[in-house]
Amino acid sequence: MWATYVFIAVSLACANGYSSGAPESVCQDMVPKHPVPPQSTPPPYTITTSTKTVKAGTPMEVVITGKKPTDKMRGLLLQAREGTKIVGKFTLAPNDPFAQLLNCGEPGNAITHKKHDEKNDKQTVAFTWTPPKDFVGEIKFRATIALNGAVFWVGVESGPVKVIS
């Protein structure tokens, strides 16, 4: 009987996760505080970019796609990184039903999901990212993507993007 209660409590916690988005406390390690570990299998998501080279201060698009129609996203934390340093800013479409900006040390330098109904889970999401005007270097987009509260992948990365002056 006791095991049943524990199972139900853990299941509810997994299902709920951070339904209103990732908290700032996970900005560095990007690991959700769900009561289950991340998946160790390859992620069923890809992160692609509109360009492999971008001029500093010039916006570009980043797209996250589930490989199959069933590979939808319930949760997301996305950043652009040069090594461990979070770089640049994101912009969102007005009234985006899925995503919101998160401040990981700087305003708008990360994106997370917002509370939404399951019908608004997404197979594909696209965002605009702009590198700082004074930044030159190489970044990768890095994400934590949750299929649901109990199934998520940490460290999903894009290929490198060069930022030039």
From Swiss-Prot:
Keyword Acetylation: no
A Pfam cross-reference name: Reeler
Disulphide-bonded residues: C27-C104
Secretion signal span: 1-17
PANTHER family associated with the record: CELL WALL INTEGRITY AND STRESS RESPONSE COMPONENT 4-LIKE-RELATED, CYTOCHROME B561/FERRIC REDUCTASE TRANSMEMBRANE
Family according to the record: Belongs to the insect defense protein family.
UniProt name for this protein: Putative defense protein Hdd11
